[in-house]
Amino acid sequence: MRYPLRLIAFISCTAVLGCSQSSDKSEQAGAAGTRADLKKECFRAVFEKDTADLVMNTTADGKVKGTLVMSYGEVKPNAVEKTVNRGDIDGSFKGDTLFVNYTYKTGSVNKTVYTNPLAFLKKGETLIMGVGDIETSMGRTYFLKDKPIDFEIGRFKFQPGECKN
């Protein structure tokens, strides 16, 4: 008697979860499709042999989502592949500074997902990536509040560019 009850409970939970997920996706698709205030911008930064490509989707209220791909240097003779960080950004503007969480993977071999805070100072059309002290507490990484973020020593200065589809 216990096994049929477990089976019925499992099927019911699966059906409920499946239905709620599909409605969430349709709501998200509808909200994204009706947003006329969404602004897409693409940027590229080059520093010596390193490059970074940033795609930002910004709403009128300053919320930002997008992608960031950073490629570092050349492939070393003993390396499996070139170091490439590829991931998503999610954050918002506070004044002229964009604060985001960058969730990424390094290369295609490493399956570990990392999340780090990033800060970009907007000067005209340029975004300058800042360097600051970070700390991890209770599984969350963040900039230290009592230490300023330095935008002068950052290696990546993003210039606006054409968006690739």
What are these regions (language model features)?
Residues 3-10:
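Sec-dependent signal peptide recognition
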Residues 15-18:
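C-terminal motif of bacterial Sec signal peptides marking the signal peptidase cleavage site
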Residues 20-35:
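Bacterial Sec signal peptide processing site at the extreme N-terminus
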Residues 31-50:
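Tryptophan-anchored aromatic micro-motifs
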Residues 58, 63-70, 97-165:
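Beta-sheet ligand-binding and adhesion/scaffold domains
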